[in-house]
A protein has these predicted regions:
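Hydrophobic alpha-helical transmembrane segments of multi-pass integral membrane proteins
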Residues: 7-8, 34-49, 69, 122-135, ...
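Specific transmembrane alpha-helical segments of multi-pass solute transporters/efflux pumps
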Residues: 15, 19-20, 48-98, 108, ...
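Membrane-interface helix-cap regions at the ends of transmembrane helices
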Residues: 18, 22-25, 29, 43-59, ...
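Hydrophobic/aromatic residues within transmembrane alpha-helices
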Residues: 26, 35, 39, 85, ...
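C-terminal-most transmembrane helix of multi-pass membrane proteins
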Residues: 36, 40, 216-218, 252-314
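Hydrophobic transmembrane alpha-helices of multi-pass small-molecule transport proteins
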Residues: 47, 68, 100, 118-140, ...
Length: 314
């Protein structure tokens, strides 16, 4: 069993760590929101039809409403904005910024009415983590300008914020009991909203399938099969068979995998500043999650990672 667990965990690291690079290749010749819509519509329909055939109940009308809200926040606001941003900034940088979702979760929980107030350890982790973001994308010492494209940078920051809002909302929303059906319904409803944005932005008018490169088509296929389906299957299996603390390591490893793959396969810059910022950001996430584990331990409750916190799914 240990061998299977490690195989699944390494597969999860590689698959979800590589989705950011796959998005970059996909949006080279496919409009970003159209790409995201196609990815989630196909993946979602496969999951819904599969689980319905397996006997899972279809979502009720109130559940579809909740799934549509989550799809708007996570898939349109989260993945859609990341896809848009990766036309402007490196995939590894996008992954590092999205890796701060646990920081936003703590901050939003602290500020919302009735939310959970952070411990001092969590507050220290927040300060360190957001300091890492500033180091990553802040002004250059030489030019005084931002390290990366401002629009792309702020789009990913907004995506991280919306991911966090969607995650917190999902904890109290009425959702299907089946994690598979929930994910499929979220993808289907989210994809329809993404297509609407794509239509409004005029992506369909300028899109010609003949102009899409083979690299972009293969990247989209990879995102559908591996990023949205195989990766999630591995994740659910790990939750059922491996220690939660081990499964949660995806939040630390995936951004690092994304940075290294981007440098290796797309020749993205890998400067000392990026490496130091990566260490600070990932370290702060570990620090905050350890604080959550300690707090949960005092309350005799395990900290279970939410599916909606999977930033690395891209």
């Amino acid at each position: 069993m240990k061998t299977k667990i490690w195989i699944a965990l390494i597969a999860l690291y590689i698959v979800w760590g590589s989705t950011y690079l796959a998005i970059r290749f996909a949006v080279e010749t496919i409009p970003p929101f159209l790409q995201a819509g196609l990815r989630f519509l196909i993946s979602g329909l496969i999951l819904v039809l599969w689980r319905r055939a397996a006997g899972d109940a279809m979502p009720t009308r109130p559940q579809w409403k909740s799934l549509a809200i989550i799809g708007t926040l996570l898939l349109l606001g989260g993945n859609g904005l990341v896809s848009f941003a990766e036309q402007r900034i490196a995939s590894g940088v996008a992954a590092l910024i999205v890796g701060t979702v646990p920081l936003w979760l703590v901050l939003i929980e602290a500020l919302r009415p009735g939310g959970v107030k952070p411990t001092w350890r969590a507050i220290i982790g927040l300060i360190i983590g957001f300091g890492g973001i500033y180091l990553l994308v802040g002004p250059s010492e030489l030019t005084g300008k931002l390290q990366f494209d401002a629009i792309g940078t702020f789009a990913v920051i907004a995506a991280s914020f919306l991911w966090s809002i969607g995650s917190i909302y999902s904890r109290s929303a009425e959702l299907p009991k089946s994690a598979w059906m929930m994910t499929g319904g979220e993808m289907v409803s989210g994809s329809l909203l993404i297509f609407m944005v794509s239509l409004i932005l005029g992506e369909w008018k300028s899109f010609n399938p003949a102009d899409v490169s083979s690299t972009s088509w293969l990247a989209l296929l990879y995102l559908i099969t591996f990023g949205s389906m195989i990766g999630f299957v591995a994740y659910i299996w790990l939750l059922q068979n491996a220690p939660i603390s081990l499964v949660a390591t995806y939040a630390y490893v995936n951004p690092l995998v994304a940075v290294l793959l981007g440098n290796w396969l797309a020749q993205e810059a890998l400067t000392s500043r990026i490496l130091i910022a990566a260490g600070i950001i990932i370290g702060s996430v570990i620090f905050i999650n350890s604080a959550r584990q300690a707090s949960a331990g005092r309350e005799a409750k395990p900290v279970v990672p939410d599916k909606e916190e999977i930033a690395s799914s891209g």
